[in-house]
Each structure stands twice: as C-alpha cells, then as structure tokens.
Regions:
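N-terminal assembly/attachment segments of tailed bacteriophage virion structural proteins
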Residues: 1-122, 131, 135, 152-175, ...
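Extracellular/surface-exposed low-complexity repeats and stalk/linker segments enriched in Gly/Pro
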Residues: 137-155, 185-188
Length: 188
C-alpha cells in the first residue's frame, strides 16, 4: 500500500456511555496501539489491551475501532467485561499508533521477491518515522537559523533540581531560580 496519511493518533471526548472509538490509520497488530485516558484534572492512565479494551480491524488500511469493555449482557461479546471500563464523562481518549521499533522482515537469498512483506516493511518504516515526527511536533524546538551552540544541559541533575528552564545572557540553555524580577527558592 502507499502511505497517504500522516495521522498517527486520534483524540476523542468521552461521555461515560460511548465504548467505541475509531482509529483512522493502519496498524499491523492489536498491540500496535497505545490507548491513554486523560481525566478532567489532567492525570493520564495508559489502558491495557484485552483488559480494558479490544481492537478491531488490525491490518486494514483504513483503521478500525478501540472497544472499551463493559457489561454488554452477552459474555461472548469480545468487549464484554463484568467491570465497566468505558471512559467517564469529560475524560479524553487518545489512541496512538505505537509500533515496536524493530525490523522483522528477512529476505532469503535466491527466493522469489516477497513484494507483500517488502511493502509492509516499507510501510512500517514510514509509520515509525511518522511516530517520531509526531513526538517531535510536541517538543520545544529552536528555529533553523538559531545560533545556539548546544541544546544540551551541561548542568548535573542535582544542580538542576528545583529550578526552572531559562536562557542565559548569551541565549544558551540554563537553569535558574529567578523568574522575572522574583529571585529565590522556587518553592516559595
């Protein structure tokens, strides 16, 4: 398949009764998804496959659904549980593609070219690149023309403890206890 979308995650508002949430991108296996529920207060909980939810349509180009488990009344339902795992009202459901960063395609010398597995391997690499880009898109970055010499902290973890990120008079990364005109302990 050609990879025609850069979507790697979907986000939804829950209402306490919805149990089905779509993911609009290809995954190869059910375990290729990470499902996180964020509470109204901001705490995040990563849910567990087959305990809190099940996945449909792994392997299809168009995606599928995450079905949170609850008491459907029919124990043969794939998403049946005696415990209600549906996200509560005002919670946010985030579904992320999260592939294992490995390459499992093996070519055997003198065998016919395995076009399907080769295409899947290329798709997997593209998906991994998209996941990395999605993470980079959520980071603080310097502009391409920035002349900062090092984006690394040279200060030890002990020296950074209880301080805030800052830029020094040269524009380099630094840590300080000063915030604006306030100077002192960050706990006060």
């Amino acid at each position: 398949m050609t990879v025609t979308t850069t979507t790697t995650k979907n986000s939804y508002s829950a209402n306490g009764t919805l149990h089905s949430f779509a993911y609009g991108f290809k995954i190869f296996a059910d375990a290729d998804l990470t499902v996180i529920v964020r509470s109204a207060t901001g705490s995040e909980t990563t849910k567990t496959l087959n305990t809190h939810y099940v996945v449909t349509n792994a392997g299809t180009d168009s995606g599928g659904n995450v079905l949170f488990k609850f008491n459907t009344g029919t124990s043969s339902d794939a998403h049946f549980s005696t415990t209600d795992h549906r996200p509560a009202n005002n919670e946010t459901v985030v579904i992320l593609r999260s592939l294992t960063k490995s390459q499992g395609t093996d070519y055997v010398e003198n065998d016919p070219f395995p076009s399907t597995s080769h295409e899947d391997a290329l798709d997997r690499l593209t998906f991994i690149t998209q996941e990395v880009q999605e993470e980079l898109d959520r980071t603080i970055k310097l502009s391409k023309t920035n002349t900062m010499t090092s984006p690394e902290f040279t200060t030890s973890a002990t020296d950074r403890a209880s301080k805030i990120l800052a830029f020094d008079s040269s524009g380099e990364l630094s840590v300080t206890q000063e915030l604006g005109t306030f100077k002192g302990d960050s706990a006060t």
